[in-house]
Amino acid sequence: MLLPDLHPYTILLSIFIVLLLKQLVASIGKSTIKEFVWLVYLKVSSNQSIKTYNSKQHELHETNKEKRAISAQDEYAKWTKLNRQADKLSAELQKLNQEIQQQKASIDKVSNALLLVLTTLPIWVARVLYRNTHLFYIRQGIFPKYVEWVLALPFLPNGAVGLTIWMFAVNSVVSNFAFLVSFPFAKKVSKPVRDTKIE
């Protein structure tokens, strides 16, 4: 199989960036990212059903406002007409909402696929393609033989460090750094209070 001839440091940096991106996605949350993509889609889309939904929603709001302004007892005919119009608009909005929800589901699928392609797929492809690549070497004698053997996992000679160990190390460092950065902004936990016995 022909592999792209990448310098080991290119692999190191690429995997570092992908793992950093993966940690960023985990910190922000996939649902937040999908919601942001949906909001951007709503802003830039020229979809007619979204525009129709917004105009009908505005029309319903105005109709309800007008309906509340008049008395049902004093102007029954006008109030009934407005009530029918509001019911009709509500039914149309419900249909449009179902269409928009289907569009949202398809946008969510695309967002999920894009997140998968950007964060998970490169890691697995790199693990398969570059599992035998020596990323860097450690001088002999720095670590005991069994540590050198562990660092050389899965298929490398002692003294070499491969992609698996590099990914493990980068993941640990990035997740710990993300924790240290997010810890001061985390929600404070109240101090536990000991229950006192009442006799």
Curated annotation (Swiss-Prot):
The lineage of its organism: Eukaryota, Fungi, Dikarya, Ascomycota, Saccharomycotina. Component of the Golgi to ER traffic (GET) complex, which is composed of GET1, GET2 and GET3. Within the complex, GET1 and GET2 form a heterotetramer which is stabilized by phosphatidylinositol binding and which binds to the GET3 homodimer. InterPro entries: Get1, Get1_fungi, Helix_hairpin_bin_sf. One of its GO terms (molecular function) is protein-membrane adaptor activity. It holds the Pfam family CHD5. Required for the post-translational delivery of tail-anchored (TA) proteins to the endoplasmic reticulum. Together with GET2, acts as a membrane receptor for soluble GET3, which recognizes and selectively binds the transmembrane domain of TA proteins in the cytosol. The GET complex cooperates with the HDEL receptor ERD2 to mediate the ATP-dependent retrieval of resident ER proteins that contain a C-terminal H-D-E-L retention signal from the Golgi to the ER. The chain crosses the membrane at residues 12-31, 116-136, 161-177. This is Golgi to ER traffic protein 1. It comes from Candida dubliniensis (strain CD36 / ATCC MYA-646 / CBS 7987 / NCPF 3949 / NRRL Y-17841) (Yeast). Keywords: Coiled coil, Endoplasmic reticulum, ER-Golgi transport, Golgi apparatus, Membrane, Transmembrane, Transmembrane helix, Transport. GO terms for biological process: tail-anchored membrane protein insertion into ER membrane; vesicle-mediated transport. It is a multi-pass membrane protein. It is found in: Endoplasmic reticulum membrane; Golgi apparatus membrane. Residues 66-116 form a coiled coil. Belongs to the WRB/GET1 family. Residues 32-115, 178-199 are cytoplasmic. One of its GO terms (cellular component) is Golgi membrane. Residues 1-11, 137-160 are lumenal.
